Design a protein with these regions (language model features):
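Alpha-helical substrate-recognition element adjacent to the catalytic core
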Residues: 1-77, 160
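Mg2+-dependent phosphoryl-transfer enzymes with acidic/Ser/Thr/Gly-rich catalytic loops
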Residues: 27, 79-160
Length: 160
């Protein structure tokens, strides 16, 4: 049973686009569907981690808003961070699911028990994951992953 899901941000929780205003203010679009899925997953007693290569106050705000317990930003070696997190939580790799969309997620996705990529993920990533989702990044892909895991964990009644 999956107890922890690990999320990449750009290209998974968002569509991968970063918008800068003329004042240099960064913005990202997050899916409300993903957010509801994440908050419900947490309420069910499961855990969520974000491991992302960039640093962003917007991501910190979204993680706080959703109650995400583990946030790692500016990470170059996602595999190492996930391995350390799993050890600190006493989780085995088969108890972890993850979503990633590009080559910097490759090693992390090979570490987990259930791996996913959005429909618009990189072709190399599509070739190694367990499931290529029908939704694109930022457009409900994380929610689709959570729905899949809820069904596989036989937790649909709890999720509702």
């Amino acid at each position: 049973m999956i107890k922890l899901i690990v999320l990449d941000v750009d290209g998974c929780l968002t569509d991968g686009k970063i918008i800068y205003s003329s004042d240099g203010i960064e913005s990202k679009n997050f899916s409300v569907k993903d957010g509801l899925g994440i908050s419900t997953w947490i309420k069910m007693g499961n855990q969520v981690a974000i491991i992302t290569g960039r640093n962003s106050t917007i991501v910190q705000k979204r993680a706080d808003e959703l109650g995400i317990q583990h946030l790692f930003q500016g990470i170059k070696d996602k595999y190492r961070v996930l391995k350390e997190l799993a050890e600190s939580l006493s989780l085995k790799s088969y108890e972890i699911g993850a979503i990633g969309d590009d080559l910097n997620d490759y090693n992390m996705l090979n570490l987990v028990g259930r791996s996913f990529t959005p429909n618009d993920g990189n072709k190399e990533i599509k070739s190694i994951v367990d499931t290529v989702l029908s939704a694109n990044g930022g457009d409900g892909a994380v929610r689709e992953m959570i729905d899949t895991l809820v069904d596989e964990n036989d937790q649909r009644d709890t999720f509702m």
